[in-house]
């Protein structure tokens, strides 16, 4: 179960990435979103969501939309990668 404690260890947050990936992909199925928008959609804190989004970006699950900044945040979209 994912907790929302403000001071979870970074390693603990990263272990949740595999669990959160389907929820993030489902949130982005509706269209591109920023990290705060993704966090709100999945019910997780933004400071943890940024870890998961960056990991998913690194491994080809997500891509930022170049030149589209909303309130200083890039929007992210799915890449269509499948397992």
What is the role of each PLM region?
Residues 29-34:
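Short capping segments at the starts of secondary-structure elements
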